Amino acid sequence: MTLPDVASGRFTQEKGFHIVLQVPETHVQIVIDAILDVAVLKQGDYDSVAFKTNTGLQQFRSLGTGRNPKSPGLINVPCLEVSFFLENEPAMITQVIEAIYDAHPYEEPVIRIQEALRTKHIPSVDEDNPNRIWNARDADWYKPDG
């Protein structure tokens, strides 16, 4: 896939990979912590940047050809999807996937890796924008120090 070249006076672009994985609800933070042990997940002036969905149901049936016995029917497990961006550094991507395999409770975790393009703001371009957190009333989720 060829990614477009996009940029403006407000943002630049960075090519890398979008990683999406499904994790049982009980193991989400364990897996995220394992990822953060090997990758900072940086986005501009922020680190530990990841997205977690609400709980959904992952379904599967074991064929009995792996470590687990054959399932008599479908199994449904409450799971979340976790997604994040990784820079185009093959060694780092390998370390992150290995960390997921080490921390994930499944024999075969569902992991999707897709070439991606992300934008990064150019600092000081719109400091006076009234929609920025620092220029508006505090959002209930944003509490600056001090």
Model-derived regions, located:
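Hydrophobic structural segments
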Residues: 1-146
